[in-house]
Regions:
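N-terminal cap/lid segment of alpha/beta-hydrolase-fold proteins
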Residues: 21-32
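Conserved HGGG/HGGXW glycine-rich cap/lid loop of the alpha/beta-hydrolase fold
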Residues: 31-89
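Flexible "cap/lid" loop of the alpha/beta hydrolase fold
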Residues: 146-184
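Catalytic active-site module of serine/aspartate enzymes centered on a nucleophile-bearing elbow/loop
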Residues: 288, 292-331
Length: 331
């Protein structure tokens, strides 16, 4: 590892509610960002892939979602799974949110000297990618993007996302007081158990998954400071959505969108017909939006998946690996 890179990376011990977590971090804009490279940071001669995370139903939104794909790709690539500020590093009053993360990414990409990297972004992290591309067109760090179930930046879907996050914004003060008192730790542990069961089910408990890494990230979620940061991030989600919606996906950036059928789980489980109709409209809105984006570049592609698992990178890892190999094989 170069002396310059060694200067950037250090070991940080987090005071978790259960056990210390040793985290690999990089410092930008005066704060630490957690990342995982699966020991590939020195492999500068290999193609680079950046993995970015977004939330699932539990609102957990960290790089645990890459604990299988990451180590698999690390066999042949230089990998960086990067977490947004404050979600893992127990940074008080962290600079949270997808907007700020877009700024952080520009600094991270420069420090890591990334060029022509493939970005694979899950769920809402497309907000940061789109803002980064809009704000830093001069950087040539990214050659192509794969989005898995990205946020739909249309008026209808944005209104829906805002409604989901509204309780956090409206009740933030009382929520933060509750969290700071340690009252959310038990609930987080329950959510961790739900998440772990889902990952085990989707992977069949495959030992190729970095289960130790999953455990470390789950321990970080139990840290009260990280919990406060997560609540603060959700409370400004509406602002992040509006910021991204004010920009356009650059027509020069090839894009692959993987659209799973995860909404079908909600639709089938809903008894209220009006709510069910709204869910179907949301699903159709996504298809239309994704197809509009992928029509911008001749190399872009829209992939409709029959998988009902939102975590496509676990449920369909072989298909995703094959897709990535095809993308990387192109000049």
């Amino acid at each position: 590892m170069s002396n310059f890179f060694s200067y950037l990376v250090y070991i940080l011990v987090l005071n978790s509610a259960v056990m210390p977590l040793v985290a690999q971090t990089i410092k930008v804009d005066g704060h630490a960002l957690h990342f995982e490279s699966w020991n590939t940071e020195e492999n500068v001669d290999k193609p680079s892939i950046v993995l970015l995370s977004g939330p699932i139903d539990t609102w957990h939104s960290d790089s645990a979602w890459w604990a299988w794909l990451g180590p698999e790709l690390a066999k042949t690539h230089r990998i960086f799974a990067i977490d947004r500020a404050g979600l893992v590093t127990a940074t008080p009053e962290a600079k949270v949110g997808y907007q700020h993360f877009a700024q952080d990414l520009a600094e991270v990409f420069e420090l890591l000297q990334l060029k022509d990297a493939l970005v694979v972004a899950f769920a809402s992290s497309n907000i940061s990618v789109q803002l980064y591309l809009a704000q830093h067109p001069q950087q040539q760090a990214i050659k192509q993007v794969i989005l898995i179930d990205p946020d739909v930046l249309s008026p209808f879907s944005i209104a829906r996302y805002k409604n989901d996050a509204a309780p956090f914004k409206q009740n933030l003060t009382s929520y933060i007081d509750y969290v700071k008192a340690g009252n959310y730790i038990a609930r987080t542990a329950q959510k961790n158990a739900t998440d772990l069961a889902q990952l085990q089910s989707l992977s069949g408990g495959n030992q190729a998954v970095d289960w130790q890494y999953v455990d470390k990230l789950q321990q970080a979620r139990l840290n009260i400071i990280n919990q406060v940061n997560l609540f603060n991030e959700i409370a400004i989600y509406d602002q992040d959505l509006d910021a991204a919606a004010s920009t356009q996906w650059p027509a020069s950036m090839p894009l692959i969108i993987i659209d799973t059928d995860f909404e079908a789980e909600y639709i089938d489980g809903e008894q209220d017909e009006s709510v069910k109709a709204d869910l179907k409209t949301w699903q159709q809105d996504a298809v239309q939006y994704y197809q509009q984006l992928t029509a911008l570049h001749p190399a872009s592609l829209y992939i409709a998946s029959s998988s009902r698992a939102h975590l496509y990178q676990f449920a369909q890892i072989e298909q995703l690996m094959t897709l990535i190999a095809k993308v990387q094989a192109k000049p």
